[in-house]
């Protein structure tokens, strides 16, 4: 045993060997200090020494230990065993692994002896993670500030779902109320320039989209709070005029009778509100510049989609408007081409100017997809663009902003960082786009959006795009757009793309892997070119497990989830787009904004928490009027979603599995909590979780603490 420790010890502390102790059953193994002249001291590491299950554990040490070392552990240190030593054997392996990684931390004796004895007596055995499904434990010592302790200062955690009548700031206040507050964000402790810093950047409580504590900097569960970042005030008293009406109605469009216009709108399922120009029916009728038309012809577009046919005349006339359309309807071109025309009719950017057109998107994948379209159609007219999002280095993004770009595509959080730092400004912005506004509100970005819009001149042109039209999006449109035009493509009710064949398999949880294997075998056996396949699951761990399962059969497979770095995501998407890997396993980060040609199949290995996410997942196929197929494994654990799924299938004229109908009839659930705007839900996510049951008061997890229990979820669209 001693040889084992002697072998391990030099490899734990880096280049300089350090004495190391390790628990092995009921034994305490201690390595000598390699190269030291004396063995009169021993290093005691936090989370590293282990006792037996009883508080008075039995220790057997090497004969090489000196008297002082034995006294340290059997004498004066006996009172600390119950504090520093875990009392159970169940976490031995996890803690020993953590200890080897933490070998560079200060010696535990020095760490503890520096605490006044009065404070040592007040130590507690609270662990960082009390939830049974967590793998590691931390020991909290009052008076010692650790970067990851559960209680940080005076307002350590957001609360654990807490009392319904409690303080919103400490969780629980939102219980029973769909718009209730969540837990407050804990103080953030970090290390910078060798010093411990403490700040409170945001508070998860108070947001109307469920609960959610924050972990310091912008990591709130559920709705999360707004960032409390300083913004420079903007003076709008002396604004230079600008032009925003560039639309010239084509004679063919002007000469169409009201009957012809109405018939076309009915065929395309277009409904309008307000004074709306007639729709175009051909690219030649919109008077786009030659360089834009050349790119349209090069990419093989034959006719505008419904959202483009009706949206381009509105956007190019300078009007504010809201477009409600399902995924894959061509809305990106619906605002990018008018943006290019708008930019080319403005004064050139000067040094220090910000963008002329700003596009806000909820996710980095969608932002990158928008940038690709902007580059394809803007490069011929030298319209520069940049994409600003979190998860990537700031340096290159900052340089692009400082050099000047006519179009900036951004996620709200990263853009606020640059605005607060003075890296860019929005004084020249006259064309604003909010893409997937409903998704941004679901993700709790409303405070950030309002802060950004407050920096833009009020006479701007604003275009808002959404897949649904709930009252939260409607309120945002009324606040930002004023007198606006609204167009809807298809039904206002949430509905699936009718070009997608939907198959639902009601099965047991344990049989899903075998069913996936059979399904993939059938797809590959029945087609020489199976196309691309996306498999959606609920958790990051399951993504990794499923990728290993698929690769075990010799099939190339990529993975995307929130813990992947931006370079990893980019590599996986390049492989997927090029066809080198035609299977992608992902969480919901790929459910929106991922526009990849050739996706023929979408498989819902785990059914999502609500039908809105299901519709957006399967919307990755069947895009641009192509056909696609979706499969869903539906278990009894998803029974509360059965009624909503049956409604989605029935609206799309799909065949309904009798077992699913039986679940829908017998389900005792009615709506459920949910994590989106259609119900409350505790603070979701890894950094401040809560449950999704009705009025759940389930514990918050992770670093922020959970918000209060959500509402009863009676607002579900499919109740």
Curated annotation (Swiss-Prot):
Task: List, in alphabetical order, the GO biological process terms annotated in this UniProt record.
Answer: alternative mRNA splicing, via spliceosome; defense response to virus; immune system process; mRNA splicing, via spliceosome; regulation of alternative mRNA splicing, via spliceosome; regulation of defense response to virus; regulation of translation; regulatory ncRNA-mediated post-transcriptional gene silencing
The coiled-coil segments of this chain are none
Q: Kindly give the InterPro entries that the UniProt entry links to this protein.
A: DEAD/DEAH_box_helicase_dom, Helicase_ATP-bd, Helicase_C-like, P-loop_NTPase, RNA-helicase_DEAD-box_CS, RNA_helicase_DEAD_Q_motif
Pfam families, sorted: DEAD, Helicase_C
Q: Which UniProt keywords apply?
A: Antiviral defense, ATP-binding, Cytoplasm, Helicase, Hydrolase, Immunity, mRNA processing, mRNA splicing, Nucleotide-binding, Nucleus, RNA-binding, RNA-mediated gene silencing, Translation regulation
EC number(s) from the headed UniProt entry:
3.6.4.13
- Supply the SUPFAM superfamilies for this chain: P-loop containing nucleoside triphosphate hydrolases
According to the entry, every stretch annotated as the Helicase C-terminal domain falls at: 519-664
Q: What coarse category fits the chief subcellular location reported for this protein?
A: nucleus
PROSITE patterns reported for this sequence:
DEAD_ATP_HELICASE, HELICASE_ATP_BIND_1, HELICASE_CTER, Q_MOTIF
Q: Which SMART domains match?
A: DEXDc, HELICc
Identify the GO cellular component terms for this protein: catalytic step 2 spliceosome; cytoplasm; cytosol; nucleolus; nucleus; polytene chromosome; polytene chromosome puff; precatalytic spliceosome
Q: Where is the composition biased (Basic and acidic residues)?
A: 99-108, 137-171, 194-205
User: For binding ATP, which residues are annotated in this chain's numbering?
Assistant: 325-332
- Which intervals of this chain are the motif Q motif? 281-309
Q: Where is this motif: DEAD box?
A: 435-438
- Stretches of Gly residues bias are at 172-188, 206-226, 701-711
Which Gene3D superfamilies does the UniProt entry name for this protein? P-loop containing nucleotide triphosphate hydrolases
What does gene deletion cause? No phenotype under normal conditions. Upon infection with Rift Valley fever virus (RVFV) or La Crosse virus (LACV), knockdown flies exhibit increased mortality. No phenotype upon infection with other viruses, including vesicular stomatitis virus (VSV), Sindbis virus (SINV), nor Drosophila C virus (DCV).
Q: Which residues form the Helicase ATP-binding domain?
A: 312-487
What is the protein's known function? As an RNA helicase, unwinds RNA and alters RNA structures through ATP binding and hydrolysis. Involved in multiple cellular processes, including pre-mRNA splicing, alternative splicing, rRNA processing and miRNA processing, as well as transcription regulation. Plays a role in innate immunity. Specifically restricts bunyavirus infection, including Rift Valley fever virus (RVFV) or La Crosse virus (LACV), but not vesicular stomatitis virus (VSV), in an interferon- and DROSHA-independent manner.
Task: Share what the entry says about its subunit structure, partners included.
Answer: Interacts with Fmr1 to form the RNA-induced silencing complex (RISC), a ribonucleoprotein (RNP) complex involved in translation regulation, other components of the complex are RpL5, RpL11, AGO2 and Dcr-1.
Assigned protein family: Belongs to the DEAD box helicase family. DDX5/DBP2 subfamily.
**Name of the featured protein:** ATP-dependent RNA helicase p62
Q: Which organism is it from?
A: Drosophila melanogaster (Fruit fly)
Gene expressing this chain: Rm62
């Amino acid at each position: 045993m001693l040889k084992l420790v002697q072998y391990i010890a030099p490899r734990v502390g880096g280049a300089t060997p350090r004495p190391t102790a390790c628990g092995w059953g009921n034994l305490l193994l201690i390595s000598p200090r390699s190269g030291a002249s004396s063995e009169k001291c021993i290093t005691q590491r936090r989370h590293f020494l282990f006792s037996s299950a009883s508080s008075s554990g039995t220790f057997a040490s090497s004969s090489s230990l000196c008297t002082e070392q034995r006294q340290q552990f059997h004498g004066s240190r006996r009172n600390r065993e119950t504090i520093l030593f875990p009392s159970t054997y169940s976490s031995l392996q996890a803690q020993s692994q953590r200890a080897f990684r933490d070998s560079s931390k200060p010696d535990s004796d020095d760490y503890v002896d520096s605490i006044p004895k009065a404070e040592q007596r007040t130590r507690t055995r609270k662990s960082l993670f009390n939830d049974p499904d967590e793998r590691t434990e931390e020991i909290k010592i009052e008076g010692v500030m650790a970067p990851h302790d559960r209680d940080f200062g005076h307002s350590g955690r957001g609360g654990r779902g807490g009392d319904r009548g409690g303080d919103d700031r400490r969780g629980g206040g939102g219980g029973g109320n769909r718009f209730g507050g969540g837990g407050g964000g804990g103080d953030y402790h970090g290390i910078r320039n060798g010093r411990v810093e403490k700040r409170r950047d945001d508070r998860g409580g108070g947001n109307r989209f469920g609960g959610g504590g924050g972990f310091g900097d912008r990591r709130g569960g559920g709705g999360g709070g707004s960032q409390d970042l300083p913004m420079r005030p903007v003076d709008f008293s002396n604004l230079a005029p600008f032009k925003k009406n560039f639309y010239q109605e084509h004679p063919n469009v002007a000469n169409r009778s009201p009957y012809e216009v109405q018939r076309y709108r009915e065929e395309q399922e277009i409904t309008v509100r307000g004074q709306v120009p007639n729709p175009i029916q051909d690219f030649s009728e919109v008077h786009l510049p030659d360089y834009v038309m050349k790119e349209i012809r090069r990419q093989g577009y034959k006719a505008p989609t419904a959202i483009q046919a009706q949206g381009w005349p509105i956007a190019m006339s300078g009007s504010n408007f809201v477009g409600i359309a399902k995924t894959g309807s061509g809305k990106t071109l619906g605002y990018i081409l008018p943006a290019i025309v708008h930019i080319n009719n403005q004064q050139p950017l000067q040094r220090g100017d910000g963008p002329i057109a700003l596009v806000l998107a909820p996710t980095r994948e969608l932002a990158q997809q928008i940038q690709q379209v902007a580059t394809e159609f803007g490069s011929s007219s030298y319209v520069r663009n940049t994409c600003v999002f979190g998860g990537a280095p700031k340096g290159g993004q900052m340089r692009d902003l400082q050099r000047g770009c006519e179009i900036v595509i951004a996620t709200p959080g990263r853009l606020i960082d640059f605005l607060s730092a003075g890296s860019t400004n929005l004084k020249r912005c006259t064309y604003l786009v909010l893409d997937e506004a409903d998704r941004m509100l679901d993700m709790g970005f409303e405070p950030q959006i309002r802060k950004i819009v407050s920096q833009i001149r009020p006479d701007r042109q604003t275009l808002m795009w959404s897949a649904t039209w709930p009252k939260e999006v409607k309120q945002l449109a009324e606040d930002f757009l004023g007198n606006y035009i609204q167009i809807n493509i298809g039904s206002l009710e949430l509905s699936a793309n009718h070009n997608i064949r939907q198959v639902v398999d009601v099965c047991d949880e344990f049989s899903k892997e075998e069913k996936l294997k059979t399904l993939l075998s059938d797809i590959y056996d029945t087609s020489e070119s199976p196309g691309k396949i996306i498999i959606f699951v609920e958790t990051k761990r399951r993504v990794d497990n499923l990728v290993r399962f698929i690769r075990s059969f010799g099939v190339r497979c990529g993975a995307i989830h929130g813990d992947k770095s931006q370079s990893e995501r980019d590599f996986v998407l390049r492989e997927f787009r090029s066809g080198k890997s035609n299977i992608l396993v992902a969480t919901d980060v790929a459910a929106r904004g991922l526009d990849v040609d050739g996706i023929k199949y979408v498989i819902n290995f785990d059914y999502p928490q609500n039908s809105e996410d299901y519709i957006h997942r399967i919307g990755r196929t069947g895009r641009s009027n192509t056909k696609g197929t979706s499969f869903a494994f539906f278990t009894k654990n998803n029974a509360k979603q059965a009624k909503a799924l049956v409604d989605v299938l029935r609206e799309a004229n799909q065949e309904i599995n009798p077992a699913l109908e039986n679940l829908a009839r017998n389900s005792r659930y009615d709506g459920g909590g949910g994590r989106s705007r259609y119900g409350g839900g505790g603070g979701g996510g890894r950094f401040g979780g809560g449950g999704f049951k009705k009025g759940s008061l389930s514990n918050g997890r992770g670093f922020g603490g959970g918000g209060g229990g959500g509402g009863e979820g009676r607002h579900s669209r499919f109740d």
